[in-house]
Amino acid sequence: MNASSRNVFDTLIRVLTESMFKHLRKWVVTRFFGHSRQRARLVSKDGRCNIEFGNVEAQSRFIFFVDIWTTVLDLKWRYKMTIFITAFLGSWFFFGLLWYAVAYIHKDLPEFHPSANHTPCVENINGLTSAFLFSLETQVTIGYGFRCVTEQCATAIFLLIFQSILGVIINSFMCGAILAKISRPKKRAKTITFSKNAVISKRGGKLCLLIRVANLRKSLLIGSHIYGKLLKTTVTPEGETIILDQININFVVDAGNENLFFISPLTIYHVIDHNSPFFHMAAETLLQQDFELVVFLDGTVESTSATCQVRTSYVPEEVLWGYRFAPIVSKTKEGKYRVDFHNFSKTVEVETPHCAMCLYNEKDVRARMKRGYDNPNFILSEVNETDDTKM
């Protein structure tokens, strides 16, 4: 190996070693110290609310059982399937015990040695196992025909009617809960995605905060409406500290903020003017701010007519000042419009004023210079000739 090849090899080894060390250090910092450095947020990127209720009284907890339908729908799948299986197995075994008790009280079991002309309440129940099988056949209406109720016992007839009615109720409730869980519009909201970052740049001569949102399905959202809430800690003039103070943020598209034609990805924007809470922020102080921007998208699912809401949030580290989104819509040779989701969250750096106040002050200066004066306090007054000023 000559000297030049050895130098190239040494350089390659050094670059690879530095790269591996850099990634290892980044992983260690993220793994062991990242959680302490992360900013707390109320709404996660996928729309889940990070909130915990403490010291809830027992009476308040009982309300969840009063509204049992919503409680069952909100349960996780593992708990729901546990309740589903337990409800059926428990009811079958419970009524199996009742059928066994009826046969035991009426002395229909073989251990009582019934006579040849003895008519049992239920034919062919010889023990707890056969009683359980009869309960199963009755509730799910299998009807094999080997075991059946006779007209000998009114108790058995009443128990048969009661189990049949209760079985229909259990079937309706549990199957309805499973179907409602599957068809909830919350799953449709998973196919609506927001850009990873929000950007701040000029648009139409105004400084705007822009966010990109896309519908991954071809079916539309009817009557879509988009808006935002800025959550921050504020102190009132009376000295009260409000931890999660909510400030309305108006987002618009070129056509407005309601009834969006959501067939392709949209770039929504908020104009940073004198009424915007972002007006006094600057590129240098953005990361020092303590706020969370929560964005909501409400709409009606076209296929099911169910109303759904999609939400996400952005913290200061996820707002890029001086960037805009890269184009993602193009036209093919066949005349179709193609959306490239590879560039969905990709941003491009552009020249942007470092604060909104600077942009509007610059516009005021240009307007004054265009009118012929640059002193905002200068007032042109009419002067009349007097006897002292006449020549």
Swiss-Prot record:
It catalyses: K(+)(in) = K(+)(out). Residues 1-77, 178-391 are cytoplasmic. A motif (Selectivity filter) lies at residues 141-146. ATP binds at G223, S224, H225, I226, Y227, G228, K229, L230. Residues 103-127, 147-155 are extracellular. The record marks N171 as: Role in the control of polyamine-mediated channel gating and in the blocking by intracellular magnesium. Residues 180-207 are annotated as: Polyphosphoinositide (PIP2)-binding. The keyword Ribonucleoprotein does not apply. Glycans are attached at N117. It is found in: Cell membrane. One of its GO terms (biological process) is regulation of monoatomic ion transmembrane transport. Belongs to the inward rectifier-type potassium channel (TC 1.A.2.1) family. KCNJ1 subfamily. It is linked to Bartter syndrome 2, antenatal: A form of Bartter syndrome, an autosomal recessive disorder characterized by impaired salt reabsorption in the thick ascending loop of Henle with pronounced salt wasting, hypokalemic metabolic alkalosis, and varying degrees of hypercalciuria. BARTS2 is a life-threatening condition beginning in utero, with marked fetal polyuria that leads to polyhydramnios and premature delivery. Another hallmark is a marked hypercalciuria and, as a secondary consequence, the development of nephrocalcinosis and osteopenia. Inward rectifier potassium channels are characterized by a greater tendency to allow potassium to flow into the cell rather than out of it. Their voltage dependence is regulated by the concentration of extracellular potassium; as external potassium is raised, the voltage range of the channel opening shifts to more positive voltages. The inward rectification is mainly due to the blockage of outward current by internal magnesium. This channel is activated by internal ATP and can be blocked by external barium. In the kidney, probably plays a major role in potassium homeostasis. This is ATP-sensitive inward rectifier potassium channel 1. It comes from Homo sapiens. The lineage of its organism: Eukaryota, Metazoa, Chordata, Craniata, Vertebrata.
